[in-house]
Amino acid sequence: MNRATPPPDLPMRPSQLPLPDAHTLPNGVRVLTLPDRRAPVVEFRLVLPFAGRAYDDPDWVGLASATARLMSAGTPTRTSFEIADEADRYGGSIGVSANTETATLTARCLSAYLEPMTRLIADVLLHPTFPPDEVAIDRANTLQRLRLQRSQPGFLAEERFRVALFGAHPYARLAPDENALQRWGADELQAFHAARYRPAEATLLAAGDFDPDALLPLLGDALAEWQGAAVAEPVPAPPMQTAETGWQLVPRPNSVQSHLMLGALCPPRNAPDSLALQLAVSLLGSGASSRLFLTVREQYGYAYSVGAHLDYYLRVGAFVAEAQTATENTHDAVRQIRAEVERLINEPIPTDELQATQNYMIGRHMLGRITLGGVADLYKQAVIYGLPLDYWQRYPDMLASLTAQQAQAAAAQHLQPDRFAVVVVGEPSLGEASV
């Protein structure tokens, strides 16, 4: 036995992901049903396409996130504690969150409590009262969280990096400032909810232990009063060119290390070469066998933590390489990250490295499908990013069929280092260097 050589990968066993069936409620809500009787649990994901952070008024940044968080803070018939207690009695939970473009109501329950859970979902969705005392508590908690975040170099780097990518576009907003949080209260939360939480173009996914013929009438009755046309056009698409390229220093005196973020805009998730680009970026910077890990960390010791990934928005993507490094290694780390991107573009990708990355990505995808909630989240992503419903069913085969040339071509098209924004949070003395 040679312990220096890892055992060969086992062959991938076929695993067919079921497709949901599509229905439409009388009020126009699209419902995707995915029955799965293996466990007595039901998962819900309700995606609302025009209620995310990008729809904040510039003077009221943070309103969309607060609206989502506080929808479960009280209704005319339930307090926040009663909502949480009732969901707990049903063996589940309920909450609402906002991302960049969309808001999502997430709920789960034991299938024995499906009917009362649909009523609880409807109450939280349709009748939030935004009690002033709960709003005040949320504001205080948010202020405390913001003050903590602004002491952390990773947050400061991402905040500046968003501006470098998107300029004045709403996607650049990462978090509110303290003054913005004081400008709105319960009335503004109610107005945002009334304007943005509409059934038109909303999609509700239900996965788990239920009979669709029984569930659909329950949902139709519970959501019957939810009416309203589409509220607005989607947020304008951002320019496809990175707003500010080159070195950008965020001074943080007395820092013993620097936080680096490098990257540029790239096509959205539903672009034709998106999967090839995901493969290239995973090979570059995902996991302990990626090129950035093996060179920047293992070979040169410039950083303990280093990696690369793609962030996706509705109509654009962003390539991000990130590292934390000692101040004296800052410029060397940036140069080495750029060098690895150049190598990815210019040198052929070895077959074994390509296959190892494909296996890694397929394996992570399969792990995400183990739980019912994971399957529900996959289809939620398909809804948010405009992917075909069979995308995740085809994903392993599509990924396995990609060639090294396709991955390299996507990298060459979208990852040109001279177009990168380079954001560094660290010592003011770092300045700009030739990197």
Give the residues covered by each predicted segment.
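Charge-rich, well-structured scaffold segments of protease-associated domains
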Residues: 1-8, 24, 82-232, 299-435
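Solvent-exposed coil/turn segments that connect beta secondary-structure elements
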Residues: 36-38, 49-51, 75-76, 110-112, ...
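N- or domain-start disorder-to-order transition segments that initiate the globular core
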Residues: 2-42
